[in-house]
Amino acid sequence: MAPNIRKSHPLLKMINNSLIDLPAPSNISAWWNFGSLLAVCLATQIITGLLLAMHYTADTSLAFSSVAHTCRNVQYGWLIRNLHANGASFFFICIFLHIGRGLYYGSYLYKETWNTGVVLLLTLMATAFVGYVLPWGQMSFWGATVITNLFSAIPYIGQTLVEWAWGGFSVDNPTLTRFFALHFLLPFVIAGITIIHLTFLHESGSNNPLGISSNSDKIPFHPYYSLKDILGLTLMFIPFLTLALFSPNLLGDPENFTPANPLVTPPHIKPEWYFLFAYAILRSIPNKLGGVLALAASVLILLLIPFLHKSKQRTMTFRPLSQILFWLLVANLLILTWIGSQPVEHPFIIIGQMASFSYFSILLILFPAIGTLENKMLNH
């Protein structure tokens, strides 16, 4: 019998082993859909981004008007821009849910997969940040100024580092051109790290909601999960297109309709919604270096999660106390997101400080403590 080209061709067999004949657990729920949704988000962002880059000019005197030109004069330019801007929001919604799934079901015990995932998150955050600067509106400019300025808190080399990043003594034309270069490059870096992420995942196979070995009960990825992924994709695209077509500026900042002006500071400088939780943690510490360290820790703490797992059970499916703690953490992150969008005044300052303290306490102290307690409860 002639060999099946799907299984023998050097390139096709890689695709086959990853997307067609991949043995998958029979019981993974819709929470396992977000990986494929993230891949589609990345593809969408790269395609819309390439189309936008064809009409964009990375120069301080032309950037703002080139974006306006794209929206007004390019065929479907308004649509491409709205898809790209809101695609970023959906990218972050998917990645937050994907990380939440990993936390809840103990997927972080696949350490290499988890760590490459954290690197992907950091790269995505960097990409979104430099991309937000490109339209060169007021919030683009001042957001870039505030966040890049944080590096000046690094002792001894800080100020030099910031001026090196800026390419001058303030955010100006050299900053914009290098941010465009980085924003063009990083999505392809993300695509590369995604391949590594999947390579590590396929070493072990997927986890499942029970957190037990599923080797005795595997099903082929296609048609079961390929179809399930298409359903998930459809369900994501409905709200995505609704947002991009009916309310494209809902999540944006009105300040960005004003061209960047170094002489006028906006009353409230704040990032896009997906960075607000980290921004709230940054602002909750009155010291500059302390705030920067807390900001870094708010994301890098994910790298510690595998070492803080003390439970004998992998997932939280049968651990009600840990479940309560998990949803407290989710509520806490929503509070931080809200605080990040508020002005720095009473009572928001103290709420932000309490929420920041709770965030680190839950992850570093309460999760391991409750895990240990649940182990003891199992013995009685």
From Swiss-Prot:
One of its GO terms (biological process) is mitochondrial electron transport, ubiquinol to cytochrome c. A ubiquinone binds at H202. CDD domains: cytochrome_b_C, Cytochrome_b_N. The keyword Transcription regulation does not apply. The keyword Heme applies. Heme b b566 binds at H98, H197. Belongs to the cytochrome b family. This is Cytochrome b. It comes from Pavo muticus (Green peafowl).
